C-alpha cells in the first residue's frame, strides 16, 4: 500500500532550493483528485532546457502530458498538485505491470546531454 496524498504542496524546499509553484499545469493536461495513493516515483530525463522552460510549456492547453515536478541544477517547479494525477507514464500503453499515472509521482530531470 502506498502513501496516501491528500494535500497539494507538502514539499516547500529540497536541499535548500525552494519549490516554485508559480507555473501550474493547464487543467486540460491533468486530472483532479481529492486524494491518491502513491506507490511509485517515475523519473524522466528531458534531454534539454531548464525546469522553468519545461514547466512553462505545460501551462499551455492540450499538451496531452504533464509531470508533478520539473527539476534542474538550480530550480524545482511543481506544476501539478501531488493529490492530482499528472500524465507522465503512458496512457494507452504501459511498460510496467503496476505503475500508472494514478499511483505515481512524475519528476522530469531537465538537463542537457552529458550534464548529469
Model-derived features: positions:
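Active-site-adjacent loop/helix surface patches within enzyme catalytic domains
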Residues: 2-116
Amino acid at each position: 500500500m502506498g502513501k496516501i496524498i491528500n494535500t497539494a504542496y507538502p514539499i516547500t524546499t529540497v536541499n535548500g532550493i525552494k519549490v516554485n509553484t508559480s507555473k501550474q499545469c493547464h487543467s486540460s493536461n491533468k486530472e483532479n483528485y481529492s486524494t491518491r495513493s502513491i506507490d511509485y516515483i517515475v523519473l524522466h530525463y528531458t534531454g534539454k532546457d531548464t525546469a522553468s522552460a519545461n514547466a512553462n510549456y505545460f501551462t499551455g492547453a492540450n499538451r496531452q502530458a504533464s509531470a508533478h515536478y520539473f527539476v534542474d541544477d538550480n530550480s524545482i517547479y511543481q506544476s501539478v498538485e501531488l493529490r492530482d494525477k499528472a500524465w507522465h507514464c503512458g496512457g494507452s500503453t504501459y511498460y510496467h505491470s503496476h505503475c500508472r499515472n494514478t499511483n505515481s509521482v512524475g519528476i522530469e530531470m531537465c538537463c542537457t546531454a552529458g550534464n548529469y
